[in-house]
Amino acid sequence: MKKVYLLDTNIVSEFSRDQPNPNVLALYEERKDLCAISAITWQELIFGVTKMPEGKRKTYIKKCIEEFKDDFEIIPYDGFAAEICGQLCGRSEQDGKTLPYLDSQIAATAIANGMVLVTHNVADFEEASERSFLRVEDWFDVA
């Protein structure tokens, strides 16, 4: 089945919280077969857990991340996404703006694969949305 939604790191992290956002959980359950994560999100998850101090929380998060790996297709950051990212960042810099690099890579992955980016950090992706065909949804704020 074609994946439609690319989940940002803050959405995936929600699943490991003690009290996850009910809207995020409900929409994920409804659409989980259509969801994937980017290789960049996978990198951010691994980085986050690796730098945590040893303890019960780190052990729990590591377990969650391993389950994520089984639950989500990981969409690679490929040459086409790199080209899109380079264009987005280059155009932004021409206008005196800087796009966050990892967010730019995640946005470019979504664009390259014709996917909707699901994030709670909509503001981080506004510049990319204005300069491209990036579609963004915030599952926290579903009416």
Model segments located where?
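Nucleotide phosphate-binding site architecture
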Residues: V12-S13, Q43-I46, E126, E137
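Generic structural signal for small/hydrophobic residues in well-ordered secondary structure
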Residues: D8-T9, L45, C85, A110, ...
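Alpha-helix capping/helix-boundary segments
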Residues: I11, T41, A81, I106, ...
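Short, well-structured N-terminal submotif of metal-dependent ribonuclease cores
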Residues: M1-S38, T50-E66, A143
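Active-site neighborhoods of divalent-metal-dependent phosphate/nucleic-acid chemistry enzymes
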Residues: E73-V116, H120
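Acidic, PIN/NYN-like endoribonuclease modules and their adjacent C-terminal/linker elements
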Residues: M1-V4, A107-A143
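Short, hinge-like loop/turn segments at secondary-structure boundaries
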Residues: P53-K56, S92-E93, L134-D138
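Residues that scaffold the ATP/ADP-binding catalytic core of kinase and kinase-like folds
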Residues: E14-F15, G48, C85, A128
